[in-house]
Amino acid sequence: FFNSRYRHQSYKNLMEAEKILREDGQFEESVTCFDYNSDGLKEYVCRMENYFAYISLISGAVQELEILKNTGNYCDNPSRVLEYDGSQEDYERGFFIDHFFTESQFEKYIKNEPAGDGVFSRIQYEEIKYSQSHHEVTLGAHAVWKPSNQKVFIRKKYIINSDGMYVQY
């Protein structure tokens, strides 16, 4: 949805439906793993008392985070599109997107200008460990950072609970 009004209304309606489903008092928090968005890859779906989120293997990031009382998706922040924004980014958006920047790229980034090559936002992370019972997901990714042609490995562990998510690198 490029029309943000429709997109926001859709998220709101989905969260209102989620609230109705939970009214029976039998809701149990869970972190499950399945192809949630029908892209052929598994996602980690976090249904907690106060929020709903999913973590994608593409970018290893949270692509949807909805606080139930606010009925909105906090990750609803699409990448810039040249036609509409006058500039374009080479990386995906979401929470806990991993970036490596040179000093000049970082200066651009903090000025809200397109920066970096976004390599970790576009690659597929792999599952290192998943514990449904402990509500933990550990992902890893290998990439080459272009400015120095240096091989980089990122490992991050999501710890999910009623209060939120913690990420350990």
Describe these PLM feature segments.
Residues 1-57, 61-65, 70-96:
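Histidine-centered catalytic/metal-binding microenvironments
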Residues 50, 167-169:
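Buried hydrophobic-core signal for structured, non-transmembrane domains
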Residues 100-165:
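Extended, loop-rich substrate-binding clefts of extracytoplasmic carbohydrate-active enzymes
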